[in-house]
Amino acid sequence: MEPGPALEHIPVMLEQALELLACRRGGVYVDGTVGGGGYSEAILRASAPDGILLGVDWDAEAIGRAAGRLSAYGRRAILTKAGFAELPEVLPRHGFAQVDGIVLDLGVSAFQIDDAARGFSFTKDGPLDMRMDPGLPQTAADMVNTLPEKDLADLIFRLGEERWSRRIARAVVERRRERPFQRTLELADTVAATVPATRDSRRIHPATRTFLALRLAVNQELESLERFLSGALDLLKTGGRLCVVSFHSLEDRMVKGQFKEWAKSCRCPREAVLCRCEGRPLVRLLTRKAVRPDEREKERNPRSRSARLRAVEKQGVPA
C-alpha cells in the first residue's frame, strides 16, 4: 500500500476482492482490517443503499481515520476497536449472529509504516516499537534487548525466513552489550552491516526480514490469524464469502492450507472405514490459486508486489 504525497492509503487488489466478495444490497459485511478505510468504503458503495459494514481494527488511530472517511454513510458504517480474531465476541455485541462476507487485508498499513513514531520502518528513524496496538505489553526493542541469542536467531529465521539469522542475532547481542537498541535505524544499520551483499539485497533492504519477524512476534499476527481461521466459517451465513489478502509466505500458507482443508469432499478421520460426513465440502474455492496484482498495480502501488488474494464461499452443511 504505497502512500502518495499525503499519506494516501491504496487498498491492494480492491477490484478483485470486491468481485469475489460479491456484495449485494442489504448485506452485512465485515472489514476485519480497516486500516485507511478503502475496503470499507468500497463495500458500503457496493452494498448500497442499505448494506451494513462492520469495521474492526486494533489500531485506534485507524478507527479514527476511518470514522472520518465513512461519516457520510451514517449508521450503515459501524466501527469498533478490536482485532479480527475477536470477531466471535464483536459480532453479537452489535446484534449480528452471522454475516454475508468478511475481508482481511493482512499486515501493516501505509499509515503505520510511514509514521516513524510507530517504529515499523527500517528507513525512517523512530522508536523501536512496532506495536499495532500501543496497549500491547512488549515492544520490538524489548525483544531485541532481552531475547537470548539463540531465541532471537530462531525467531528471525522462523518468522522472517532470514538465512542470515544467526549472524544477525550475534551482531545484535554484541551491539546491545554496549548499549540497548532504542531506535529503528540503530537496528536497521546493524543488520545491514551484517548481512552479506547479494543480488537479493539490491532489490530489498537487508533489514526487511528481520523487521518482519519482529513485527509478527510483537503483534502475534500468525497466532491471531490461526485463531480467526479456526472459527471463521461459524461467522458466515451459508453462501457467505471470505476474502483474505496476505503479504508473505507464512500467512499465505496458513490461509491456503485452511481453505484446502475446508474444501475437502470428505473430512472423516483417515482411520474411518466409512464416510459419515456425506462427502460435502464446507466451502467452495473461489480462487483455485492465489490471485496476484497485475503489473500496472505493482507499478502504481509497489507494496502490492508480494500480495496474494484467496477466497472461499461457505456451503450448506447437512444437519
UniProtKB/Swiss-Prot annotation:
Record-level GO cellular component terms: cytoplasm
Disulfide pairings: none
UniProt keyword Kinase present: no
Transmembrane regions listed in the UniProt entry: none
Primary localization class, coarse: cytoplasm
Region Disordered, residue ranges: 292-319
Protein localization: Cytoplasm
A UniProt-annotated Pfam family: Methyltransf_5
Alphabetized GO MF terms: rRNA (cytosine-N4-)-methyltransferase activity
Keywords, sorted A to Z: Cytoplasm, Methyltransferase, rRNA processing, S-adenosyl-L-methionine, Transferase
Biological role stated in the UniProt entry: Specifically methylates the N4 position of cytidine in position 1402 (C1402) of 16S rRNA.
Assigned protein family: Belongs to the methyltransferase superfamily. RsmH family.
Identification of the protein by name: Ribosomal RNA small subunit methyltransferase H
Lineage: Bacteria, Pseudomonadati, Thermodesulfobacteriota, Syntrophobacteria, Syntrophobacterales
Gene: rsmH
